[in-house]
A protein has these predicted regions:
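Surface-exposed strand-loop-strand hairpins of Gram-negative outer-membrane beta-barrel proteins
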Residues: 31-33, 45-75, 215, 221-224, ...
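Hydrophobic h-region of N-terminal signal peptides that target proteins for export
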Residues: 12-20
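Loop-centered beta-sheet repeat module
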Residues: 209, 215-263
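Outer-membrane beta-barrel pore domains
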Residues: 50-52, 63-66, 116-121, 131-134, ...
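N-terminal periplasmic/intermembrane-space "pro-region" immediately following the signal or transit peptide
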Residues: 5-6, 19-57, 431-432
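Bacterial N-terminal signal peptides that target proteins for export
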Residues: 1-9
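Solvent-exposed loop/turn segments connecting transmembrane beta-strands
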Residues: 71, 98-99, 178, 228, ...
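Outer membrane beta-barrel
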Residues: 28-48, 67-207, 230-235, 239-247, ...
């Protein structure tokens, strides 16, 4: 057994060595310049014409005529840095500040007998979204190792604010899937002709952090100083751009989740429970003749959802689990179309400015199917319609305005809102 594994390891090393030598002979830079710095960010202001009380779903009638509420947010600000070491080796990093980052301060409280107190000044997150080392053998064969993006679904692959029309990321995918989904792992990817392909090996999701409203969305990453790796998962993505202006994509994920917890149970009651997560996704983009049309459909299935729900509800109150019912199936689908009015005006053709009028429709339900004996939170399923404008004074900057309306089950109150935002995405400097 050991000798067989050693033999395979030596063969793999030999192949790697030969490919590496060939890449060194070419010595062609991976990036246009050795060092690249870029990023993206967005600021959004929203007024929601519905109550934000936490009981608005359990007691909908009491909040039917409740006043609305406004919010101003910095959903994402990201700094990206890439470096080409040469000989086919490169580095990619991305640091994300969500909702303005986080701040804390220590103060002396005069009303607390002069005691020192630590206070949270700003709520938010700072996260390392990408950190990988890549070896490029050829255009068709690249090996990426480290903290990488999991490109399942449209939004995880195309998540910059210039790649969707709405002020916030598409709500359906970002509700049921981790978004942006980033994880420690290994990725093999490449391009050949009109095809791009990628296969990944990752640690499994953590089933104790599955929830009703967000299904598996909060189960990637880790609340600890390390990522639990008791189970492994696989993911893939295939894109085809053979037709000019059209991209067609398939992606998917499969992996067990139940044992991927800090203290996995050994109880006979849960013997054989795996909590296998399976996700299939199709998305596309058409961009030609002043028209952009994008669409996606995602379907996910979780085995042993009943056992996982019961296990999570039995955990301690101070655990990382939300201790909620978890659905066996979740779904999200959406389509959006935008037309560039400036592109139809002769005097504006050939200029960087664009003015899109768009509409978007989506349906999603994080509790699409629920195992018998579990409560179904029907407010988790909804339709959402949005319409608005995107003005690009230049390619890297966009100003957005949007009206949206969320249509829930008739026993709940609908959720209309208006939003305005400004965003950028691009390289800060190009030559070093």
């Amino acid at each position: 057994m050991k000798s067989g594994l050693l033999k395979y390891a030596l063969v793999a090393f030999a192949i790697f060595y030969v490919c590496n030598a060939q890449a060194e002979q070419r010595e062609k830079p991976i990036f246009p310049y050795r060092l690249q710095i870029g990023g993206y960010g967005e600021v959004v202001g929203t007024y929601n014409f519905f109550s934000d009380e936490y009981l608005r779903y359990t007691d909908a009638k009491s909040y039917k005529d409740a006043p609305g509420h406004g919010r101003v947010d910095i959903p994402h600000f990201v700094i990206w840095l890439g470096y080409d070491f040469g000989k086919g080796w490169s580095l990619g990093t991305e640091v994300e500040f969500e909702h303005g980052g986080t701040e804390s301060a220590v103060e002396i409280e005069t009303e607390e007998a002069g005691e020192y107190e630590s206070e949270v000044e700003r709520g938010g997150e700072v996260a390392l979204e990408q950190f990988w080392i890549q070896k490029s053998f050829t255009r068709a064969a690249n090996l990426r190792m480290g903290h990488i993006i999991v490109p399942v679904g449209a939004t995880n692959m195309y998540h910059m604010p210039t790649e969707f029309f709405t002020c916030y990321r598409p709500e359906g995918e970002s509700t049921i899937l981790p978004c942006t989904w980033h994880e420690n792992g290994i990725s093999f990817w490449g391009q050949a002709g009109g095809w791009r392909y990628e296969a990944l090996i990752l640690p499994g999701l953590d089933s104790d952090r599955f929830s009703s409203q967000n299904w598996i969305a909060s189960a990637s990453g880790s609340p600890y100083e390390f990522k639990i790796g008791n189970t492994l998962a696989g993911a893939f993505r295939v894109d085809n751009t053979s037709v000019k202006g059209l991209r067609l994509s398939l992606s998917g994920y499969a992996g067990n989740s139940f044992k991927n917890t800090l203290a996995p149970t050994e109880s006979d009651r849960y013997k054989g429970v795996k909590g296998t997560v399976m996700i299939g996704s199709f998305d596309f983009c058409y961009n030609a003749h002043n028209l952009i049309v994008r669409g996606n459909f995602d379907y996910g299935h979780l085995t042993d959802s009943y056992a996982i729900t019961k296990f999570n509800m039995s955990l301690r109150k101070d655990s990382v689990s939300p201790q909620q019912t978890v659905a066996s199936d979740a779904v999200a689908g959406g389509i959006e179309a935008g037309y560039d009015i400036f592109g139809a005006i002769p005097s504006m053709k050939g200029k960087d400015q664009k003015f899109y009028v768009f509409g978007r429709y989506e349906y999603f339900d994080s509790m699409f199917k629920v195992a018998e004996g579990l409560n179904d939170s029907r407010w988790c399923g909804r339709q959402r319609v949005a319409t608005g404008i995107n003005y690009y004074p230049m390619k890297e900057i966009v100003i957005k305005c949007e009206y949206s309306h969320g249509f829930l089950d008739p026993i709940y109150n609908n959720e209309p809102a208006i939003s305005i935002g400004v965003a950028f995405a691009g390289l800060f400097r190009r030559n070093y």
